[in-house]
A protein has these predicted regions:
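Ribonuclease/tRNase effector modules and their secretory precursors
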Residues: 1-114
Length: 114
């Protein structure tokens, strides 16, 4: 339910994770909201972070930490955004941080530069 077991490795079921956000069964840390606002994701910050969680693309998985990095493009602001979602507790995933990625460190905001 939430995790698919492939041998020793548990992978996130992004469909299940998205459903938690669609159903309103999630949390957002104060830190994620503050960082989003500092980066210009205003007004309706929480709504925009929720939209990113539902519509974004998983670009990195941190299986050991039970977290994913999601990329989305906010159309209104014309801003790329990254959010980190912790799924340690499947019934209520948490957006733990958010930020506008820096192009010096990312290729098309999706691939980490070496």
């Amino acid at each position: 339910m939430g995790l698919a077991n492939l041998g020793n490795r548990d992978l996130v079921d992004i469909g299940y994770l998205r459903k938690r956000f669609i159903d309103g069964e999630y949390a957002i840390s104060d830190h994620a909201i503050i960082e989003a606002r500092k980066d210009g994701i205003v007004p309706r910050t929480v709504e925009k972070l929720e939209w990113a969680a539902i519509n974004g693309e998983v670009i990195e998985e941190y299986v050991d930490r039970k977290r994913v990095l999601i990329y989305a493009e906010l159309k209104e602001e014309k801003l790329p955004v990254h959010i980190v979602v912790d799924y340690s507790f499947w019934e209520e995933p948490v957006i733990v941080t958010s930020y506008v990625p820096d192009s010096r460190y990312w290729i098309k905001y999706k691939i980490r530069k070496k």
